């Protein structure tokens, strides 16, 4: 499979699923995932091949949006770790993650759009 790891509190396998269940009625339309293949290569394909999902940085839109962010960018903009913690973070995160904000389009159409890029 192309997907290595999914971060979504609506999944029973998510480490904070229990907490999310008490805080969210229907979880959310935001999820993050990693791929086995280099994320930047997939992101470049997405820019050319996506027909329904828009490759853009934003939140809270009716349209579905996806964006890839590299681990270097995540570390520079969000986290401040000591060297040992930074090393563990990089091992866990790989080269980066995709953030998908699901809009109101049909789920089967969105799935087909994503599959085309992998």
Question: Each predicted region: which residue ranges?
Answer:
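PLP-dependent enzyme catalytic core of the Aspartate aminotransferase-like
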Residues: 37, 64-118
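Conserved small-domain helix->loop->beta segment predominantly found in fold-type I
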Residues: 1-71, 84-92
